[in-house]
Every structure is written in C-alpha cells, then in structure tokens.
Regions:
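Short amphipathic, positively biased membrane-proximal segments
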Residues: 1-189
C-alpha cells in the first residue's frame, strides 16, 4: 500500500490558529526591575534620608565630606542600574502588544519621556552635586549652605535641590506608567 505524505503547510492553513504574541522575556523584565530598583531606591534614600541626615554632624566640613563620599560610592551603582533599566525599557518597547490601545500608546510615550528625564536629572544631580560639595565645602546639608559656604556652592546647592525633586518625580513617573502599561498589556492578551 502506498503511504500518503500529508502537506503540513496546507493543513495548517485550514486550522484555526492564533499567533503567539512576543512578550518581553523574563531576563529583560528582571534586569529592568533590578536596575530601576537600584537607581530609584538609592536616589530616594540619598535625597530623602542621607542628605538631610548629615546635619547631625557638628563640623560643617565633615557634612560636606560625608555627602560627597556617600554619593560617590552610590553613583556607579545608580548609573548601572538606570542604564540597565533604560536599555531593558527600550527592548520591551520593541515588543508592544499586537492590539495596542490608545491608552497604551500614550502611556508608552509618557514612560519614554520619564525614563529619559530620569537620565537627564541624574546627570544634572551628579554634576551639581560634584560642584556643590567640591573640596568638602562647609554645608548644613547637601542642599543647604552655612554662613561659611561659598556663594557659587550655594547656587549649585539650589540647582541640586531642583534636580533632586525632578529626579524623584521622573522615578515616580516611570513606576506609575510602567504599572499602567503592564495592565494595558494584560488587557490586550
């Protein structure tokens, strides 16, 4: 008896099928989450806890030294964390849901803005922070000078306050838009 070899491609054409959506991989998502946690967690701690806590030190020059050393130790980790989160974010953006809602499209653009803003404000904070506590200038805290603080350092501290608030706002924006996108992605599956 002659064996009949089925034409698999023809058979597949007649069967109902659903194309599988390519979602971001687990590794990409994990790198994004870890990177964002390191950057944002460290930034929140530094801005809201460490910067004002140096006021307990009696010597204003020691305050400047403590702030400078604390941020110098965190900056490489924060930069790597934000870098990982940014790369992973754009990798995930390359795999949007098949059926994108208008909400998804709008919020995805907003998240792009916030993640780029996080990078810009982090660089601004880094630059102003380096200048504000340069040579361990006497300070009250990272963002407040003393009577002995040079005027140019006080101006840098003022800019650092603004950059720090913007940095936290961008971080919150990234987290909120990320939650909305995850919800929208699950609706489209």
């Amino acid at each position: 008896m002659k064996k009949i070899k089925p034409d698999v491609q023809k058979i597949k054409a007649y069967l109902p099928h659903r194309e599988v959506e390519k979602k971001p991989g687990t590794l990409t998502r994990a790198l994004y989450d870890i990177g964002l946690a390191v950057w944002f967690g460290g930034s929140v701690f530094g801005i809201l806890a460490m910067n004002p806590a140096v006021e307990v030190l009696d010597d204003p020059e020691e305050r400047g030294k403590m702030v400078d050393e604390g941020w110098a130790r965190f900056q490489p980790y924060g930069a790597v964390g934000l870098g990982l989160a940014t790369v992973a974010h754009f990798l995930m953006r390359a795999r949007p849901p098949k059926k994108q809602t208008d909400t998804y499209k709008t919020v995805a653009l907003l998240k792009d803005f916030f993640i780029i803003g996080a990078g810009v404000t982090s660089v601004a904070s880094l630059a102003l922070g380096e200048y504000a506590v340069d040579d361990y200038a006497p300070v009250e805290s990272a963002t407040e000078g003393t009577d002995e603080t040079p005027e140019d350092v006080e101006k840098a501290q003022s800019g650092l306050s603004i950059a720090s608030i913007a940095q936290l706002a961008c971080g919150i924006g990234v987290l909120v838009t990320g939650a909305i996108l995850a919800s929208e992605r699950s609706k489209s599956s």
